Amino acid sequence: MVYAIVRAGGRQEKVAVGDVLTIDRVPVASGETLQLQPLLLVDGETVTHDASALAGVKVVAEVVEEAKGPKITILKYKNKTGYRKRQGHRQPLTRVKITSIGE
C-alpha cells in the first residue's frame, strides 16, 4: 500500500490515493488540481523521508469543494462593568481528493 504524509494547511496529514481530506482554504477553484508537499513516502516496505529523494515525488490533489467549518462562539466578559462581547466564526475550508502519489 502506498501512502504519504503531506503538509497541508499547516498540519500533517496521512493520505493515500482516493482519500478525501479537509484542509484550510487554498485559493484554487473547484475542479482544479494542486500539489501537496510530501514529508514522508511509504511504498510497500520502502520508507522515504530524505528531502532530496522526496524532491521528485508529487502528491496531486483535485479540489472537490469549498466549505465552511462549524460555527464557534467567542465570548468576552469583564466582571462588574457590564462589558460583554459576543462574536462568531466559521473557518473557510477546502475539500480535496488525492488523485496520485508518485514521481
Curated annotation (Swiss-Prot):
GO biological process: translation
Keyword Mitochondrion found: no
Gene Ontology cellular component list: cytoplasm; ribonucleoprotein complex; ribosome
InterPro entries tied to this protein: bL21-like, bL21-like_sf, Ribosomal_bL21, Ribosomal_bL21_CS
Keywords from the UniProt entry: Ribonucleoprotein, Ribosomal protein, RNA-binding, rRNA-binding
GO molecular function: rRNA binding; structural constituent of ribosome
Superkingdom assignment: Bacteria
Residue ranges of coiled coil: none
The keyword Transferase appears for this protein: no
Family note: Belongs to the bacterial ribosomal protein bL21 family.
Oligomeric and partner information: Part of the 50S ribosomal subunit. Contacts protein L20.
Described function: This protein binds to 23S rRNA in the presence of protein L20.
Name of the protein: Large ribosomal subunit protein bL21
Source species: Kineococcus radiotolerans (strain ATCC BAA-149 / DSM 14245 / SRS30216)
Species classification: Bacteria, Bacillati, Actinomycetota, Actinomycetes, Kineosporiales
